Regions:
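Aromatic-lined carbohydrate-recognition surfaces of secreted/lumenal glycan-active proteins
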Residues: 167-226, 271-285
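N-terminal module-boundary/linker segments of secreted carbohydrate-active enzymes
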Residues: 13-66, 91-99
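Glycoside hydrolase catalytic-domain groove-lining segments
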Residues: 235-285
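Conserved, mostly hydrophobic/aromatic
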Residues: 128, 240, 303, 311
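Alpha-helical scaffolding within the catalytic cores
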Residues: 55-57, 112, 218-231, 260-267, ...
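A solvent-exposed, charged loop/short amphipathic helix patch at secondary-structure junctions
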Residues: 89-96, 140-176
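Aromatic-rich peripheral "rim/lid" segments of glycoside hydrolase catalytic domains that contact
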Residues: 290, 302, 316-387
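N-terminal signal peptide
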Residues: 2-5, 9-29, 346-355, 379-387
Length: 387
């Protein structure tokens, strides 16, 4: 008997070669994180303890930043052109990335990080939310166009006799190089200081579907090419946090589903094996009304079906800055968000159990058909195997 056990133990490394497995069933869950500043509601006697009761991942005592998730809003001192009165812009740290002090920014970023995420062993979601400018030159359109204008002005002053085309090339080159250094070194420092966290920038990878620049569900070829060229950043990213914020006007349920799928297809294409946690908001971003139950279900179910590792429900401070708003959100949690998450978890669990039962049945069939092979494995003498 002892010899048989010894031979079996010696043969255990060979079992996967014959399609055999000793793994136990895994826990099947699609985590949904609560990233809403509902701590502001505590002063009204509303502690939002029901969040965890519904199965959402919530920080201890409803802290906005805690052991599960921590978002850093505009941390450090990224260069930026801050809006001021009269349509003016105030330059912060050089205004544009090619003119900023990286040393100053990283020093301040480290201070902010150590204060906001004090636990060096933090292993949750770590999101850097910086939206003043985009690293790809051509993507700074609309309200972000001042970054291109100011960059051109800088080059005109540096090279007063250059043609406009030469100024454009130089401005583009220096801007994108500076943006690359700031974003990449910030991410690397975050990973160095909190190495167990899942680090990424909010909104990336971009898609811009169903916008004036691309009124289709799929991301444009140009944007996909931009994302491919951002390998320098994505190779350091340990989690992706694309935005799935919905709008109400000029959209309908099916179109919103296509919007979600288009963004997720690009995120999954870029991410490969890196986990994706899309950000969803419980309000439409154009009218600020609560989204329908159907839209909430789609915002959670479609990411799960696409292979995302979870989702993040976000909320703004202005959503919970009064007692009335807090009560409204708590009702919405119990009527829409909570049931949607609960149903999703039950569905995910059923699918997981079903898949596991299929695996077990397949293994039983394999056992019956290949009992002779198993017996042959157990009949081997441990001395037949050389190290």
């Amino acid at each position: 008997m002892r010899l048989q056990v010894g031979v079996l133990v010696a043969c255990l490394p060979l079992l996967p070669l014959f399609g055999l497995s000793l793994e136990e069933p895994k826990e099947y869950i699609f985590p949904v994180y609560w990233n809403v500043p509902t701590f502001q509601c505590h002063k009204y006697g509303l502690n939002f303890s029901r969040v965890k009761d519904w199965g959402l991942q919530q920080n201890y005592q409803d802290e906005f930043r805690g052991e599960e998730i921590a978002i850093l809003y505009d941390p450090g001192e990224f260069p930026a052109l801050l809006p001021a009165s009269g349509g003016r812009r105030i330059q912060r740290n050089g205004g544009v990335p090619q003119e900023g002090s990286l040393t100053r920014h990283l020093s301040l970023f480290q201070g902010h990080l150590e204060k906001l995420i004090p636990n060096v062993n933090f292993s949750g979601l770590a999101i850097i939310d910086f939206e003043h400018w985009r690293p790809v030159w051509r993507q700074n359109w609309g309200s972000l166009s001042p970054y291109r204008d100011f960059s051109r002005l800088i080059e005109k002053r540096r090279h007063p006799f250059w043609f406009s085309s030469m100024v454009e090339v130089e401005a583009t080159y220096r801007y994108e190089l500076g943006a690359r250094v700031f974003l990449l070194d910030t991410l690397r420092l975050g990973k160095k200081l909190r190495p167990l966290a899942k680090w990424g920038y909010y909104g990336f990878p971009f898609c811009f579907n169903y916008t004036p620049y691309n009124n289709r569900a799929a991301c444009s070829y140009e944007v996909q090419l931009d994302n491919d060229n951002m390998y320098w950043l994505f190779s350091e990213t340990t989690a992706y946090y694309p935005s799935l914020y919905l709008k109400y006007n000029d959209m309908y349920s099916t179109k919103r589903q296509r919007f979600i799928k288009g963004r997720l297809e690009e995120a999954m294409r870029v991410a490969q094996e890196v986990p994706v946690y899309p950000y969803v908001w419980y309000k439409y971003h154009d009218n600020h009304q609560f989204i329908t139950k159907e839209d909430m279900v789609n915002l959670l179910k479609i990411p799960k079906d696409y292979g995302c590792k979870g989702a993040v429900i976000w909320g703004a401070s202005r959503d919970v800055n009064s007692r009335e708003k807090c009560i409204a959100l708590q009702s919405y949690l119990d009527e829409v968000i909570g049931p949607a998450v609960k149903d999703l978890h039950e569905e995910t669990f059923r699918e997981g159990i079903s898949d596991h039962e299929v695996d077990e049945n397949s293994e039983e069939e394999f056992d019956e058909d290949d009992m002779e092979l198993k017996e042959k494995i157990l009949s081997y003498d441990v001395r037949d195997f050389e190290v």
